[in-house]
C-alpha cells in the first residue's frame, strides 16, 4: 500500500485516461519551436509560436489525456484545450547557459508551483540535463535544486514530473554511435538517483534507454546493440524504477516513436504512457510556415490526428496504469495533506 495526498492523486487522475494511462501531448518547446517556425516562415514573431501551439492544442487534445505547455507562449493553447484534457506546466527556463559547465537548470523567475496550480495546472514538470559522471560540484547543485522543487510541490500538493535528459560531458554528439553505447548506463543511473524519496518525484518522464538508430534491425548503418540487448535495457530500466514512468519522444519521427513503443509493448515494459511532442506535430510546422493557419488546421485534423490516435492504440495495447508500481488501484491510499 502507498499513501498519496489528495492533491497529487487528483492531479494524476486528471492527467490520465480512463485506464489510468497518461496519453499526453507535449508542446512546451520554446526556443527550439521559435527557430523551427522562423525557418519555415522566414519571420520571427511571438504570436506565430502562440498561434501554432493554440491550433495544436485545439485540434489534438480531444485525443490526449493531457497536454504539457509553458506559460511563456502557451497561455492561448491552455485556454483552447479540450475540457477533458489535463494540464502539465513547465517550470524551468528553456535551454541552459552554455557559457558555464554542467548545463545547470534555472527556473522561470515569476513562476512557482503555487502559481502553476492557481493557473489550473495539474502537475509541475521540470527538465534537468544530467550526466551521472559529472563532478560532484556540478551534480550536487542539481540534486539540491530538485530537492527544493520536490519540497515546493509537496507544500502545495501538486504532482512533480521530472524529465532527466542524459548527456556525457566529453561526448558532445548525443546522436553519435559513441554516445549510444554510453546511454543505457546513463539512463539507469538517472532512474536510480531520481527515484529516491528525497526528491519527491511522482512520475519520471524518461528517455528510452537506447538510440533506436543503432539497434539491430532498426539501424541503417552501424549497430550499438542487438535487439536482445536493447530489450534487456528496457526491462532493466522498468525494473529499476519504483515510480510510475512515461516515455518522451525526444525529437524522433512519428514512425520511429511508434516503433519504439511497439518494442516496449513486445517486451512487457511497465511504462504508464507517453509525453509525445515533435513526433506528433513537427511535420505541421512546414505547413504552417508556408501555407498558414487553415492549412495547419487541416493537417492537424488528418495527419496530426492519425499520429496521435495510432499512438493511443499502442498505449491501449501495452501501457499500464500509473498506480501499477504500487500494486492495484486499491493499494493507493489517498490522504488529506496535513
From Swiss-Prot:
Belongs to the aldolase LacD family. SMART domains: DeoC. The keyword Lyase applies. This is Tagatose 1,6-diphosphate aldolase. InterPro entries: Aldolase_TIM (IPR013785), DeoC/FbaB/LacD_aldolase (IPR002915), LacD_aldolase (IPR050552), Tag_1.6-dipho_adolase (IPR005927). GO terms for molecular function: 6-deoxy-6-sulfofructose-1-phosphate aldolase activity; tagatose-6-phosphate kinase activity; tagatose-bisphosphate aldolase activity. Pathway: Carbohydrate metabolism; D-tagatose 6-phosphate degradation; D-glyceraldehyde 3-phosphate and glycerone phosphate from D-tagatose 6-phosphate: step 2/2. It catalyses: D-tagatofuranose 1,6-bisphosphate = D-glyceraldehyde 3-phosphate + dihydroxyacetone phosphate. The keyword Lyase applies. Keywords: Lactose metabolism, Lyase. GO terms for biological process: 6-sulfoquinovose(1-) catabolic process; D-tagatose 6-phosphate catabolic process; lactose catabolic process via tagatose-6-phosphate. Its EC number is 4.1.2.40. It is an enzyme of class 4 (lyase). It comes from the Bacteria. It holds the Pfam family DeoC.
Amino acid at each position: 500500500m502507498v499513501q498519496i495526498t489528495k492533491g497529487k492523486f487528483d492531479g494524476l487522475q486528471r492527467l490520465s485516461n480512463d485506464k489510468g494511462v497518461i496519453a499526453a501531448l507535449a508542446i512546451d518547446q520554446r526556443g527550439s519551436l521559435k527557430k523551427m517556425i522562423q525557418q519555415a516562415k522566414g519571420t520571427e514573431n511571438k504570436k506565430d509560436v502562440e498561434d501554432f501551439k493554440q491550433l495544436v492544442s485545439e485540434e489534438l487534445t480531444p485525443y490526449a489525456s493531457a497536454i504539457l505547455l509553458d506559460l511563456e507562449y502557451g497561455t492561448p493553447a491552455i485556454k483552447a484545450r479540450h475540457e477533458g484534457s489535463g494540464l502539465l506546466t513547465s517550470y524551468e527556463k528553456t535551454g541552459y547557459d552554455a557559457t558555464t559547465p554542467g548545463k545547470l537548470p534555472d527556473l522561470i523567475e515569476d513562476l512557482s508551483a503555487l502559481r502553476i496550480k492557481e493557473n489550473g495546472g495539474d502537475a509541475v514538470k521540470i527538465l534537468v540535463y544530467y550526466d551521472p559522471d559529472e563532478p560532484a560540484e556540478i551534480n550536487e547543485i542539481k540534486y539540491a535544486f530538485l530537492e527544493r522543487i520536490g519540497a515546493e510541490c509537496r507544500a502545495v500538493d501538486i504532482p512533480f514530473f521530472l524529465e532527466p535528459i542524459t548527456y556525457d560531458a566529453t561526448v558532445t554528439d548525443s546522436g553519435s554511435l559513441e554516445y549510444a553505447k554510453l546511454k543505457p548506463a546513463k539512463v539507469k543511473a538517472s532512474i536510480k538517483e531520481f527515484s529516491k524519496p528525497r526528491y519527491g518525484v511522482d512520475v519520471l518522464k524518461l528517455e528510452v534507454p537506447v538510440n533506436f538508430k543503432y539497434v539491430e534491425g532498426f539501424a541503417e548503418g552501424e549497430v550499438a546493440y542487438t535487439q536482445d540487448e536493447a530489450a534487456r535495457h528496457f526491462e532493466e530500466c522498468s525494473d529499476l524504477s519504483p515510480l510510475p514512468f512515461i516515455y518522451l519522444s525526444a525529437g524522433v519521427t512519428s514512425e520511429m516513436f511508434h516503433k519504439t513503443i511497439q518494442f516496449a509493448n513486445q517486451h512487457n515494459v511497465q511504462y504508464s504512457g507517453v509525453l509525445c511532442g515533435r513526433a506528433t506535430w513537427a511535420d505541421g510546422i512546414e505547413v504552417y510556415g508556408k501555407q498558414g493557419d487553415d492549412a495547419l488546421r487541416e493537417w492537424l485534423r488528418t495527419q496530426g490526428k492519425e499520429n496521435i490516435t495510432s499512438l493511443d492504440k499502442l498505449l491501449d495495447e501495452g501501457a499500464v496504469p500509473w498506480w501499477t508500481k504500487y500494486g492495484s488501484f486499491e493499494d493507493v491510499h489517498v490522504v488529506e495533506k496535513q
